[in-house]
Amino acid sequence: MAKMLKDALKTIEKYKSITPHYGELLDILGEILILREEYRRKMKKVIFPIDEGLMEKKIFGGLPLIDFSTGTFDLTEPKEYFTALLEIAEKRAPGETKEVLQMIQDGNFNYEKMISDSFNSLQDDDIAEGIDDDVIDLVDLFLEESLRPALEKVVEKYGKSVAKAGWTEGYCPICGKEPKIGEIREEEGRRFLFCTQCGFEWRFMRIKCPFCGNEEQQTLAYFSIEGEEKYRVDVCNECKRYIKTVDFRETKEEANLDVEDIATLHLDMLANEEGYD
């Protein structure tokens, strides 16, 4: 993990010189990665226990190992990490998250419910009233990140077993979240999807939409920007969803998809402009 962190920070520095307009975001990401590793190292409790006897049934039944809709978890440590993340943002932009930090101190921010709601796309944002949209986006990002150290522990312990089990769904087999980015790698050009919620990567069909399961080649497409062919946006014209894809096979680089997700935000904007979600 220490080497991965070191490599990620080097990549961030490289991208800051190539794409200076993302400099501030990349700086924040660097701080988050350092803090993530710190919290992961000091986390002693098992926050997301896995019933190993049910693992095989869950995987073959298309169910993620962790069920956030019905599970009850002690989220004390993730909540501490969430508060620390808000403090990073407040330090960089005073006043940005002050209101949310005050809500936490006053007991008016139900962190546990917000986490549960983040796994249910039908739920509305409880904090939306009177708070700037940019701050809500930041809070959503930090809610997701706050679980990452604890979920990485699950990935470390069970990731290899899950990878061997042949998961075929487009959502994460560990936590159930949908991917935002993936990569093409190995000589055979295999496709892997990446979960920004827990950090797990799993193999997935090249010609298939991870969101609706569409396999009709004529309704699946991709586009890229001239000069940035190592990045592309895969789109599905059935469900109008998209996913970013990284292909570093020519350059032989190793992709850190946490960093690449930030470094390719312009592709998200482009996909949205083209009518994809």
Q: Model features per residue range: what roles?
A:
Residues K153-A271:
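Cys/His-clustered metal-coordination modules, chiefly Zn-binding fingers
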Residues A2-G159:
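N-terminal alpha-helical interaction blocks
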